[in-house]
Amino acid sequence: MRRSTVNGCAVSFCHQPNRGDCLNEIGPIGYEAAHAHAERLFRQLLPACGLTVREGQIKLCHTMLDALYNKEVALCDAGVGLGKTYAYLVACILWQLQRPRPLRSPVVISTASVALQDATLQEYIPFLSRVLIQYGYIDTPIRAVLRKGKERFACDLRLQERRLQIAQRGERFAHRAALLREVGRCLDLDHVAGLSRYDRRHICVPTHCDRRCAERESCRYQQYLRESNGPTITIQVCNHNYLLADALHRQNGWKPLLRDYQALVVDEAHRLPEAAQQMATCRLSTQGLAQLAQQLSGLHLTRAAQQVTACARALAGVYAPQQNEANAGHGDLPPVQVPFTVTKDGTLALAALQKTLAEIQDTYRVRLTLPLLHQLKEMRTRAAAFAQPDDTTVCYVEYSGIKSGPGLSHLSLCAVPRDLPRQLYDLLWRQEKPAVLTSGTLAAGGDFAPARRQLGLEGGTPDRKSVV
């Protein structure tokens, strides 16, 4: 597969048996025809190109087609090696063909693992694309794109600045200079092995891009966005966190991260609640405060940095005793989590933090960057939430066993919403778009009830189930 800013699928033909009554770029197809084409693909055409006929795979595809055509959610418990990826790819593509070409929208495939994303883009989609072209189902390759956070891509302007800095440091930095030259050829930072975290942080696309940027027209990242949101994209692939972030943007009326889509596939669906909890958790950490202090110090706001560091140490001093008490008699390792309790000392430390952050905002507003102002405001909001927690969240203290800085224990105050399944329903299922959820662990003993509850599907969402 050709690597580019958008993952286009190169087409190469497998051995072509007698085409017989094969189609020439089929037009819109209906429900019955879609099921008939699924049978033909899995029993004749795909086996002719090297795949094995699997009855479970065919059953899955029919269940998925039913859900897509009836605007339902399909819950599919299917083990490893059954071929569920081809099942949902075929179902989605046949379902897309029900509409005239100008009215087709992409589908989104969300997974939990990078390995599955890579396999989908580099193996499954190219193979299926050439088979469908060979037998006249489509006349152009399936175009799929990997969508992920902007911090994983290079900013051309920041890259130029960083390369200039490294070039001035001589031969000792030759290896880093070579890596930065490679970034000039590869937009995706995840594909540049050996790149340090420090360099990544200094060359990635910033949180807020300046619309007046001199490089905007030639910017590779902007080109990637234009191509990703173009009309020729059939499939968008992302991870669960990116899917949920897009849903959150839509819920809040912000600019969506994904192009509007007509159906959703969630592979490794048992990992979706975990991703939702990770994103919904309100977290105030000593590590975050230490990083804030470093940013302030970088702007030569030494006094402000010292104030934030003092607040972080005070917070660690209040909650570190819980670590020691809970661990008494159980060795040197701290527990991962302990319940959060409201104490007088804790309330005072959180109040002092809120006051300090507010003073920094007011005193240095002109010198602070917009992202830093947002960060200060967000930390104030979190500190206030822990100073007066309510019944809508479950609060705890989390320890990592490492240090955030000299004499500073790394701990986080965490708050998880109690109504997480309801939030998932509001984010993903309330819109009543058809969806396919698949995993090898959705049905415990054939019972989907626990998974439905965790996934937020108990709000009246119509669904159909399949165990293969």
List where the protein language model places each region.
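A substrate-engagement module of RecA-like helicase motors
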Residues: 24-47, 55, 99-236, 240-241, ...
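N-terminal pre-P-loop "Q-motif" helix
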Residues: 52-68
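Pre-Walker A (Motif I) flank of P-loop NTPase domains
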Residues: 69-74, 105, 234, 433
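Walker A/P-loop
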Residues: 70-90
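Signature of the SF2 helicase/ATPase Hel1-core->accessory helical subdomain module
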Residues: 88-90, 94, 115-118, 122-126, ...
